[in-house]
Curated annotation (Swiss-Prot):
Keywords: Secreted, Signal, Sugar transport, Transport. Its main location: secreted. CDD domains: PBP2_TRAP_SBP_like_1 (cd13674). The keyword Transport applies. It comes from Bacillus subtilis (strain 168). Part of the binding-protein-dependent transport system for uptake of C4-dicarboxylates. Responsible for growth on fumarate and succinate but not malate. Is not directly involved in C4-dicarboxylate uptake, but plays a sensory role in the DctS/DctR two-component system which regulates the expression of the dctA C4-dicarboxylate transporter. This is C4-dicarboxylate-binding protein DctB. InterPro entries: DctP_fam, TRAP_DctP, TRAP_DctP_sf. It is found in: Secreted. GO terms for biological process: transmembrane transport. Belongs to the bacterial solute-binding protein 7 family.
Amino acid sequence: MKSLLACLALMIAGIATALFIGFHDHTGNKKIVYDDDQEGLQDQIVFKFSHVVAENTPKGLAANKFADLVNEKSGGKIKIEVFPNGSLYSDIEEIEALQNGDVQFIAPSTSKLGMLSPEWGVLDLPYAFTDYNAVKKGLNGSIGTQLFDSLKKNQLKGLAYWTNGFKQITTNQGPVKTPDDLKGQDLRIMQSDVIEDQFKLLGATPHQESFNSTFQLLENNVVDGEENTISNIYSKKFYNVQDYLTISSHGYLGYAVMTDEHFWKAQTPETRRILTEAMKETTEWNETYAEQMNKEQLEEIKKNSAIHIYELSDKEKQEWMKRLDPVYRQYEPIFGRELIRELLELRKDS
């Protein structure tokens, strides 16, 4: 019996030794091989970019282009994770998320920034810009600089301005040709007192609601209509639940790409260089592509929907401007006479 137990013990010891030697040969004496993806993940930095619109919009496409350029310029060492359609934060939540460090990049509509600094409301004034050249001149010049400077007190850093386009009006309550046609209508608008006051001036009842709730509000007849760019009307299919579209171009819709100042300063000079270069190239692309996209998608709406479309003539736009001019006087004490003057000068030049 003892000899049997001894034999068993020797066998177990032999097996254990063989296993150890085999394991050692495969791991201890050889370097573990990583594929390219695994190697990249060992030192990859990941930043989050949250926005609330669809990917097939000027902002959605710009965010993805920025991510691609950062990946390319960093050799895969910096990854921008893009969260579209409000999948991470709503347009009401994203600024706080940025300040809390839960996300590193956002691109809220400029209308949202009035809650941080009232001067941002100047971009919501009716017919603030009358064409894309005026937008570029204003935001790439003194007006854009002043607005980004106003964010510093909130420890936020403005990186770029991205354009969506000019806002149009959709409704189920008959064609909108004159300012009086909006009287008595309930309209969904962005969070902006300036926008609210201009629609009240025309006799409408504006409702400040989140962007991603708009389709449901229209579908359930909670509101009669809304204002938005062609790109947003197309991507969110508002034309399926609205009967009339007026090409009024009465307001500008754009975005301020932002990050947190503390986050930015914590990055290495090389990381900041890569992010800055990628943002510059993306912004130049957006300035050209946004205008083209809105034109193309208007043609798609014309071809593929039953919505009735009316385009204001230049003479009719002048009538709308005249009716809405009191909003400029109302907000001059808040925005400052100089900022208003610069905006009106751009209107003259365009």
